[in-house]
Amino acid sequence: RQRQMCIRDRAETPLHDIRLMMMRKFSDIPALTLTASIGHKLHMETVFKKYNPDYVFHAAAYKHVPMMEDNPGEAVINNIEGTRIIADLAVKYGVQKFVMVSTDKAVNPTNVMGCSKRICEMYCQSLNKAIVDGKVKGCTQFVTTRFGNVLGSNGSVIPIFKEQIKNGGPITVTHPDIIRYFMLIPEACRLVLQ
């Protein structure tokens, strides 16, 4: 079977940007870009059936804490239900490895977004254990990786800080004792691919 990369996102513009970047930098790797929501079960089933992926890197999520505090139902629908849909499909279609990108906010969560990601982690962990214990038929290995702040990524706090400094400050911090952990995009990529 020919290797190819299938990239799925529901945000059209970033998906188009990825397509152009892949053509420019990695023209030897066929890259399919599909606009779809992970919460759309029938569409996701079609994607898994048609492309039969060996690996799934699941980074889809609503991640802005204040937005999810105001829209908790969306955190449940997109983050939790979307994860359940594609994790179950990964098992059904024999994906070798399912890597879920989570957040440091899932550690002892104190907000809706962190809680939603912790539930996603728990679902993937329990599915992995059920496969290992023979309670669920499958071969998929589930792995979760947690990130803090990824410099240069969408939603990073750095652009907010830059804008606040440009406008004369002050810099907004959620708590004076908070410690923020940062990594670069290449470091995040290496962590996901381990």
Feature locations, PLM:
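Hydrophobic/aromatic anchor residues within beta-strands of the central parallel beta-sheet
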Residues: 33, 75, 98, 142-145
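Conserved Rossmann-fold cofactor-binding substructure of NAD(P)-dependent oxidoreductases
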Residues: 35-55
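Helix N-cap at the beta1-alpha1 junction of Rossmann-like dinucleotide-binding domains, i.e.
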Residues: 11-14, 38
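NAD(P)-dependent short-chain dehydrogenase/reductase
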Residues: 88-91, 112-194
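Conserved Rossmann-fold NAD(P)-dependent oxidoreductase catalytic core, especially the SDR/UDP-sugar
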Residues: 58, 62-122, 126, 132
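Conserved residues in the N-terminal Rossmann fold of short-chain dehydrogenase/reductase
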Residues: 34-35, 77, 175
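A short helix-to-beta-strand connector/capping loop
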Residues: 26-31, 138-140
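Short, small-residue-biased leader/transition segments that mark boundaries at the very start
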Residues: 2-7
